Regions:
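Extreme N-terminal regulatory/targeting segments of RNA polymerase sigma factors
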Residues: 1-59, 63, 97
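Promoter-recognition and DNA-melting modules of sigma-like transcription initiation factors
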Residues: 66-106
Length: 106
């Protein structure tokens, strides 16, 4: 558990530093990453919404994409976490849109 004083220390950390801590199973750290990335997720969801899926459903898929990014990010890859997360989030949303389209066609 992270104390309130530690929480303010967390806000000073970079996304990459938070990802390293989140990988150790710290929920508070993941919550901070979610709050930092939520505007990006909402913006992508609004941009990608389709008749088959509303922005809220797409945002939910985006948060799943963020979780995947936290679990799979490697600093050695050369991209910032934010860039990597944006790709994971967008890919997850696009997969959900494709799935919704194929479900409607069936």
């Amino acid at each position: 558990m992270i104390s309130p004083g530690d929480r303010s220390d967390l806000t000073a950390l970079s996304d990459e530093q938070l990802v390293r801590l989140a990988g150790k199973g710290t929920e508070e750290v993941f919550g901070l990453l979610v709050s930092r990335c939520a505007p990006m997720i909402q913006q992508q969801a609004l941009r990608l919404r389709r008749v088959s899926m509303d922005a809220e459903d797409l945002a939910q898929e985006g948060f799943v994409g963020l979780l995947s990014a936290v679990r799979t990010y490697r600093e050695e890859g050369g991209a910032s976490f934010r860039t990597y997360a944006a790709v994971c989030i967008r890919n997850r949303m696009l997969s959900a849109i494709r799935q919704a389209g194929s479900d409607e066609a069936a």
